[in-house]
Amino acid sequence: MAETNHSKRISELRSLLNKANHAYYILDSPLIEDAVFDRLYRELIELEKQYPSLVTPDSPSQRLGNKPATKFESIKHRIPLQSLDNAFNFDELNYWHSRMQKHLKSHSAMVCELKIDGNALALSYVNGVLTRGATRGDGAEGEEITANVKTIVSIPLSLHLQNPPAWVEIRGEAFIPNKVFISLNKERLKEEKQLFANPRNACSGTLRQLDSRIVASRHLDFFAYTIHLPDDWIPGETDPKKPKGQWEALLWLKAAGFRVNPNAKLISQPDQVEKFCIDWEKRRHQLPYTTDGIVIKIDDFKLQKTLGITQKAPRWAIALKYPAEEAPTQLNKLIFQTGRTGTVTPVAEFNPIPLGGTLVSKATLHNANRLSELDIHEGDTIVIRKAGEIIPEVIRVIKELRPNNAKKLVLPEKCPECNSKLLKETGEAATKCLNNDCPAILRGVLRHWVSKGAMNIDGFGTKLVEQLVKRKIIKSIAGIYELKEKNLENLERMGTKSAEKLLIEINNSKKQPWHKQLYGLGILHIGEANAKAIAEVFPSISLLADAAIASPESISNIYGIGSEITESLHKWFNCSINQNLIKELKDLGIALERVNEEGAIDNILMQEKLQFSGKTFVITGTMPSLSRANLEELIEREGGKVNSSVSSKTNYLVAGEKPGNKLKKAKELGIKVINEQELMTLISN
């Protein structure tokens, strides 16, 4: 009886949350408040944990996978995904249209759609439920990425139809919105990782992530544009009728719960097609996503069938491609910049050129490998492309215009800032300065610590950082908290009042959350998202340091944290300079651990947010990396209670080496026995 009641409640929650998602992401008309959604979603999760047999594939809880995939399976497309023929000007477009008219012998309406610069996906729905998502691949075969597809909230997990087809395939374009792309690259820039060249590459790389949590964090979007319905499908009373053309197909997709690009247009006159294309080429930079052309399709499905397909493309459609955003300019000079992790990056400076509605005068070459590939010389004429209409990049050199006796430009052997010898590790693209006293590295470290994503110290700008480093007033981030008015008053743009205000901001920054403090330390490969994930599992820097030094694998159990990050943490915490920095920061009042609003260690978090609430643990034996005190702290901060003896009320026995009689008693009572690593996995999950 209880399960029946819970089944009804789960069904109600599932239906309401799916409707709320559709209203928020597709209709842009929120149905319920975020806080209400969160509470209902949490209730659904808890009920599904209690009754796993009641979980359905279309439950909102299924958007995020339980564990990363090990690899993607290659699958054969039921219907091949063909590419489109391209037209690069209106003469070619008109030639295509005149050929169509000859075959059709009568005028036909056309549908014009914006060509989204993303990645094509094929989505299979069986009896209305999403069962498979796949990449285009070579058109005949793609990769099955269903777990990643489910994280895209604009893709419904079930069709909004009364009588869904036994099988239907939906096709469309996954893409990264421009704001998300810019934010993602800013994060990578802070971590000194190679930037994504454009949103399409970022989307492609995201879809191929084995961990769906990473995919979810990048907020991909999706526009549907094609359906493959079975001939025998009969719509329900409230369902849209079976479409007879592309325009009706878009309406069908919208009714079935998909996001359809709102700028598509049904056009009856050929001259209107050209007008549509010209209009959108001018307006495309105003869109929140990138487009690289216009797709024109004959509307009528019967006429499409008459026209047929070639070996690689349908005859009834064509893509008019926008001209590339490229321009030549002369290289003025190549400068080399040392970043906060010591990486030296070549940056091309050139005569300003207009691209994508902005003036561009610089382009980063990322690393020595790219510099070598381009073979840049002094005074070269270089071609700049605003890749993805956002990031300027040098794409080639016009060698025919190279000045006589021009000198080849190469990465320097010494740091441009401190003159220390540069080193390049085997297999790495980056060349680095390893001098801990390098002023450029210190400036970068300070800017990172005071940034909005870290300690958020308002008024601590770049000019101030430069002055403090140049005058040797500060030698580490700890020095920020030792500043006095007398250190600041005589600096540029700094009077007594400004100094007082800044010192208040510095003191207030000590209250920043633990995950922001961790991010601010600037550990290689630790971005904002990774710092937050790590801080949720390790509530203090002492616990994190113990694990990083003695048991890095316990950190790799956290979703999204791979060997690159664990190695970086291991190296950072083993460095005596960093160990001294931690001590200095703690002495100066930065807790480097999770605290509540009153400044106490946060043991009073809401119980429903702590996964060990109501659970009792007993610890026995010697652990491989963490002390008993560390383990107790971890368990208690997750809401659990630690007892000294095993009883029938014990939920878990955490056993290390030489566990003694407690292990025997736990087995007799049927109590779950776990080791240290399994405890860390429980916490990370």
UniProtKB/Swiss-Prot annotation:
Annotated S-S bridges: none
InterPro entries for this protein: BRCT_dom, BRCT_dom_sf, DisA/LigA_HHH, DNA_ligase, DNAligase_adenylation, DNAligase_N, Hlx-hairpin-Hlx_DNA-bd_motif, NA-bd_OB-fold
This protein's record includes keyword DNA repair: yes
GO molecular function: DNA binding; DNA ligase (NAD+) activity; metal ion binding
Pfam families: BRCT (PF00533), DNA_ligase_aden (PF01653), DNA_ligase_OB (PF03120), DNA_ligase_ZBD (PF03119), HHH_2 (PF12826), Nlig-Ia (PF22745)
Keyword Lyase set for record: no
GO biological process: DNA repair; DNA replication
Positions contributing to NAD(+) binding: 34-38, 83-84, 113, 136, 173, 297, 321
Keywords from the named record: DNA damage, DNA repair, DNA replication, Ligase, Magnesium, Manganese, Metal-binding, NAD, Zinc
Residue numbers annotated as active site: 115 (n6-amp-lysine intermediate)
Classification via SUPFAM superfamilies: BRCT domain, DNA ligase/mRNA capping enzyme, catalytic domain, Nucleic acid-binding proteins, RuvA domain 2-like
EC category: ligase
Assigned GO CC terms: cytosol
Positions with a binding annotation for Zn(2+): 415, 418, 433, 438
Reactions accelerated catalytically: NAD(+) + (deoxyribonucleotide)n-3'-hydroxyl + 5'-phospho-(deoxyribonucleotide)m = (deoxyribonucleotide)n+m + AMP + beta-nicotinamide D-nucleotide
TM regions (residue ranges): none
BRCT domain mapped to chain residues: 607-685
E.C. no: 6.5.1.2
Function text: DNA ligase that catalyzes the formation of phosphodiester linkages between 5'-phosphoryl and 3'-hydroxyl groups in double-stranded DNA using NAD as a coenzyme and as the energy source for the reaction. It is essential for DNA replication and repair of damaged DNA.
Family: Belongs to the NAD-dependent DNA ligase family. LigA subfamily.
Protein name: DNA ligase
Gene: ligA
